[in-house]
Every structure is written in structure tokens, then in C-alpha cells.
């Protein structure tokens, strides 16, 4: 249930940039100090550093994206404002974890968050992307962050907790097959073809779940485009 983590990061990998959307729990804002609005800083009697300097430090100290193991991308701030936490259904919240015998926590009761949108532009499409969150002195994630990654709108994974480092191998031809090197950071529907065999008292039922894009490799479906199936094509 990482979608119930106090902090949420949605990472959108696009053709020429990475778009980072953050919901920062009100009690964890200090960890993301370089995103605190200038008005808030001035109210405390302190003059904030220039935005360019704060974004540079955010890119190197707080939320890092490293492409092809060598280039650290520079963040640009798009929007920072107060909001209420977005509701993300978690069917496991409140249930008992069979391994720990502890109740699975839901989202924080305090719904106040600092909402932030940032972009990290790049000039050439990278083959790998390493994601590094804010770290503690011991080298672990400083605060719990539930995260999800999309590449050109395709979910690369399900919600998971962001570890101290996560390396993603990118497939630009078909983002469905982009993969994290860590096995615990994967989508439940990992393959484009999944078969379910149901054995019941009076029947055996075989169900096949296949992506349209993979099915087109076997037969011509006569679809007009690659992104959408028109109503008339059903």
C-alpha cells in the first residue's frame, strides 16, 4: 500500500524531460526545504537564496535523476502550492498483514501537503535512469515516499516505496517493457500476455489477458492508430 505513504512522488518520463509531481506531507516539509515558497521563508525573517541556486541544490541534494550513470539532470520549478492530499484507494489499508500480523496503515489523517511540480529536461533520450530520493546520514531514504513511474503515459510499475536508489532501464520503442533492476519494483502485470487457469469442481476455465499491441504482432486488427481504440473499432 505505498499509495498511502505520507509522501507521494509521481514520475512522468516524457520525450525530452522528466516531470516530477510531489505531494509532501506537512510534517516532512523540512526534508524538502529548497521547495519551501519564498513568502514562507520571508515570514520567518530570512531572505531566501535565489530560485536558481535552490533548484541546483534540490537537484543534487534532495531529488536526483541521473541518466546513463553519468549526467545529473537539473530541476526547474513549475509550481509549488498548498493543497490537500489526493485520495488514492488502497484496498489493503486497515487489513492485517499475514506476515507481520500488524494492521496495514492508511494515509495520514492530516491531509495537508505541499504540492510541487518540477521538470528535469534532457537533450537525448537516456537508456537508463537512476532515481535517488532525499537520503539520511545513514544512506537510507530520509522520509517514506510512495512512488510510481510512467513513461509516455505507460505505467512502468505499481506503487512502491522509493528505496535509497532505483535504476530503471528504458525501452523507448515500447515503454511497457521498461524495467527496474530491483525485482521488488515491478508491475504486477509484468508480461504483455498472461494466462489464468481456473480449476473448479465441474470445469477447467482458461482465461487469457493480452495487450492489444502484442496481439497485433499475430494478426491484423485493422486499428487506425497506436494510442487509442476508436468506438467504431470495437
What are these model-predicted stretches?
Residues 1-234:
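N-terminal soluble domains immediately following signal/targeting peptides that reside
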Amino acid at each position: 500500500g505505498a499509495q498511502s505513504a505520507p509522501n507521494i512522488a509521481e514520475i512522468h518520463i516524457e520525450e525530452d524531460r522528466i516531470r516530477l509531481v510531489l505531494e509532501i506531507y506537512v510534517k516532512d516539509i523540512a526534508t524538502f526545504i529548497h521547495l519551501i515558497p519564498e513568502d514562507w521563508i520571508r515570514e520567518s525573517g530570512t531572505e531566501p537564496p535565489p530560485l536558481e541556486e535552490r533548484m541546483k541544490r534540490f537537484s543534487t541534494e534532495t531529488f536526483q535523476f541521473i541518466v546513463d550513470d553519468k549526467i545529473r539532470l537539473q530541476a526547474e520549478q513549475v509550481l509549488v502550492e498548498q493543497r490537500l492530499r489526493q485520495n488514492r484507494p488502497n484496498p489493503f489499508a486497515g487489513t492485517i498483514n499475514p506476515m507481520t500480523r500488524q494492521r496495514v496503515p492508511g494515509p495520514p489523517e492530516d491531509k495537508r501537503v505541499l504540492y510541487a511540480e518540477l521538470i528535469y529536461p534532457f537533450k537525448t533520450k537516456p537508456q537508463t535512469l537512476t532515481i535517488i530520493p532525499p537520503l539520511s546520514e545513514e544512506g537510507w531514504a530520509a522520509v517514506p515516499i510512495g512512488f510510481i513511474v510512467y513513461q509516455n503515459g505507460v505505467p512502468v510499475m505499481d506503487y512502491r516505496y522509493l528505496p535509497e536508489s532505483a535504476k530503471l532501464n528504458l525501452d523507448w520503442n515500447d515503454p511497457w517493457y521498461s524495467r527496474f533492476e530491483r525485482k521488488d519494483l515491478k508491475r504486477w502485470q509484468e508480461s504483455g500476455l498472461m494466462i489464468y487457469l481456473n480449476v473448479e469442481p465441474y470445469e477447467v476455465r482458461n482465461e487469457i489477458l493480452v495487450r492489444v499491441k502484442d496481439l497485433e504482432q499475430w494478426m491484423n486488427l485493422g486499428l487506425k492508430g497506436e494510442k487509442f481504440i476508436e468506438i467504431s473499432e470495437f
